Curated annotation (Swiss-Prot):
Its EC number is 3.4.24.-. Its main location: secreted. Disulfide bonds join C116-C270, C137-C156, C287-C325, C296-C318, C305-C322, C348-C384, C355-C377, C364-C381. Keywords: Disulfide bond, Glycoprotein, Hydrolase, Metal-binding, Metalloprotease, Protease, Repeat, Secreted, Signal, Zinc, Zymogen. Metalloprotease. GO terms for molecular function: metalloendopeptidase activity; zinc ion binding. InterPro entries: Astacin-like_dom, MetalloPept_cat_dom_sf, Peptidase_M12A, Peptidase_Metallo, ShKT_dom. Glycans are attached at N340. The active site is at E165. Residues 287-325, 348-384 form the ShKT domain. Zn(2+) binds at H164, H168, H174. GO terms for cellular component: extracellular region. It comes from Caenorhabditis elegans. This is Zinc metalloproteinase nas-12.
Amino acid sequence: MLYIPQFSIYFCLGYLLLFCKISNAVKQSWEINQELITEANKEHTVFGDMLLTPAQLIRYENSKDSDLSIRGVSIKGSSMNRWSNNIVPYVISPQYSPAQKQILVSSLRYFERVSCFKFVERTTQNDYLFIVPLDGCYSYVGKIGGRQTLSLAADCIADYIIWHEMMHAIGFEHEHQRPDRDSFIRVDYANVIPGQMINFDKLKTSHVEYPDIYDFKSIMHYDGYAFGRVDTARRVRLATMTPLKPGVTLEDNMKFTATDIEKLNRLGQCGARGGQYSNQGVVASTCQDVATAVSCEGNRRRGMCKNPFYKQMMIKSCQKTCRLCSYTRMIDEDDDLTPNTTVKSVKCEDKHPRCDIYSHNGFCTLPFYDDVRYQLCAKTCNLC
């Protein structure tokens, strides 16, 4: 029988190489949109993942100010741009599978846990979100009135992307477009993909409120390589944003920070009604890796800490190295409300052609594979 160390991810180099692809690393909305958005929608989609109304588009095209003055909504928008009583009605397109819908609803339920905003299925409300799988991940900023499209294509169905787009829909801009951002990051324009400079424009000071510290880890901050050109010789993407603060890195932000939640609750005037996880950005002192330091560091370098496919594995084995300790605490406190991408499929079937071989090598029984066997070999492992 093939021996597979319980906490080693190096099975990627062995029998399971066929389904372990490092190229499937976690992607942000801007990356997905670069691949999926059609030319027609590119005319209306700006700043990576935001839509403009026709009126906003006209103002943008006629604007000669390098600072953005086109937005009908921002964190400092008027009450007409806000969702009444913090209630956001929504309709989920029937195009989504039951599994995708479960992830969507679960993500909304978690959003409610950290705030006093409520997402309710639409009945007769005139203003509502229509969540539909179009050609990317994008949203308007704040309420625009009537049926409001929020696109989440299949590749966008991940909790952190859903939260990011919902933050836009409620009224939040990107953190890296703050008027004061140049005091905290340097934008390397020479490394930006031609035609994508607009994604680094700053908002007008009069349009936003920013009494909080600059939040490098905000779920509304893009990673440091966003819209970066690819150096074909070295086969790497070039950095477009560099933190000015020593020791800080701009990574894929996949969860709310304490500052995100404070802003969210201040906008909704939540008081004591929401934000019970506002301290989640603090890593618990008991946070430890179970796997060896060498194994966890190797997993981190290969991108597995940020890959949703391996998320539960990393929480169990490398939570300290992967900086997933606060996420573990949230799972422990409220398992049923924590989004989980391992969802039950309607059809009982295997997703991988070699499940019979994997089953003989312990794939169906070893605890290490608890979080992936259902996705790949549900039928062979008798899980449905």
